[in-house]
């Protein structure tokens, strides 16, 4: 990848970053093309799919991170995602950078109607999809809030100030772009070094199907129940073996080894118990003296 003149060389993407963007299909656009997104398209495939220029994707990620880092209060940055694939990504981004997250349906009036309970006055908005988050972007334009958005080749760019060209329809591409953006913000703030790796895996930003999580929990519970049942059955079998007298001779010898008076008990069992009290003296005579 050729070095960019838009920012210092230290901010250039590494080979690993480019491989991650390609592996997550961030370069795969749609068949439709918005005229203002034409500058971000590298070429058009034979099947009509537009290929996004990954170099420009990285440049816009760095630009967006530098804009976010200039906001003094991280809570004044509002990240929005109406698309389910971006819910987990925006929540993780907010947790790591201190931003405010709106995951799910955007309530109309959040940025314009001060009477509503959820009224907010952010200084910057980051949207996952300009089409799905159109209401949030429209309200931001009313109150002059700058907007950063993840834009596909067919995304409308009305009221979008900074467009990050990427595939905003795949859960892997959405999660990876949010992860790269969070990492770059933390690096610019000094929380991370550029030479060290971030201990947060990119998988933490990926969408997970709730049904898949339930299936994993059910499988884990079933495995624990099976292990407990096996332990109970083994203990019951050992108890039955002891009750039936089927104890190994070596085990019995080891258990009874060193016991005192073992033979005396056997002799006392065969003797006459009535003769034991005959050897005692007359206690009444002793008391009379």
Curated annotation (Swiss-Prot):
Keywords: Cytoplasm, Ribonucleoprotein, Ribosomal protein
Predominant location: cytoplasm
BP GO terms, sorted: cytoplasmic translation; ribosomal small subunit assembly
GO molecular function: structural constituent of ribosome
One family name in Pfam for this protein: Ribosomal_S2
Compartments (UniProt record): Cytoplasm
Record InterPro entries: Ribosomal_uS2, Ribosomal_uS2_C, Ribosomal_uS2_euk, Ribosomal_uS2_euk/arc, Ribosomal_uS2_flav_dom_sf
GO cellular component annotations of the record: cytosolic small ribosomal subunit
Keyword Cytoplasm: yes
Function: Required for the assembly and/or stability of the 40S ribosomal subunit. Required for the processing of the 20S rRNA-precursor to mature 18S rRNA in a late step of the maturation of 40S ribosomal subunits.
Quaternary structure note: Component of the small ribosomal subunit. Mature ribosomes consist of a small (40S) and a large (60S) subunit. The 40S subunit contains about 33 different proteins and 1 molecule of RNA (18S). The 60S subunit contains about 49 different proteins and 3 molecules of RNA (25S, 5.8S and 5S). Interacts with rps21.
Family: Belongs to the universal ribosomal protein uS2 family.
NCBIfam families, alphabetized: uS2_euk_arch (TIGR01012)
Protein name, per record: Small ribosomal subunit protein uS2C
Lineage: Eukaryota, Fungi, Dikarya, Ascomycota, Taphrinomycotina
Gene: rps0c
């Amino acid at each position: 990848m050729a070095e960019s003149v838009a920012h210092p060389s230290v901010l250039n993407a590494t080979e690993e970053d480019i491989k991650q963007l390609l592996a997550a299909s961030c370069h795969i656009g749609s068949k439709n093309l918005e005229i203002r997104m034409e500058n971000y398209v590298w070429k058009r495939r034979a099947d009509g799919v537009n290929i996004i220029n990954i170099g420009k994707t990285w440049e816009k990620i760095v630009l967006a991170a530098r804009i976010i880092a200039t906001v003094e209060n991280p809570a004044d940055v509002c990240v929005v995602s109406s698309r389910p694939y971006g819910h987990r990504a925006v929540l993780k981004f907010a947790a790591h950078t201190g931003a405010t997250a709106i995951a799910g349906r955007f309530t109309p009036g959040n940025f314009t109607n001060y009477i509503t309970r959820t009224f907010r006055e952010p200084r910057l908005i980051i949207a996952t999809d300009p089409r799905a988050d159109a209401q949030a972007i429209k309200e931001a334009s009313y109150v002059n809030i700058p907007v950063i958005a993840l834009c596909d080749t067919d995304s409308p760019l009305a009221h979008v100030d900074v467009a990050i060209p990427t595939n905003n329809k795949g859960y892997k591409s959405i999660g990876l772009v949010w992860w790269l953006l969070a990492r770059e913000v933390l690096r610019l703030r000094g929380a991370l070094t550029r030479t060290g790796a971030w201990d947060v895996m990119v998988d933490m930003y990926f969408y997970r199907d709730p049904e898949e999580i339930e299936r994993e929990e059910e499988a884990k519970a079933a495995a624990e129940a099976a292990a407990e049942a096996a332990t109970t059955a083994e203990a019951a079998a050992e108890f039955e073996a002891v009750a039936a007298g089927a104890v190994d001779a070596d085990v019995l010898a080891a258990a009874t080894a060193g016991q005192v008076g073992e033979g005396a008990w056997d002799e006392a069992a065969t003797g006459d118990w009535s003769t034991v009290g005959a050897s005692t003296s007359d206690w009444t005579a002793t008391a009379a003296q």
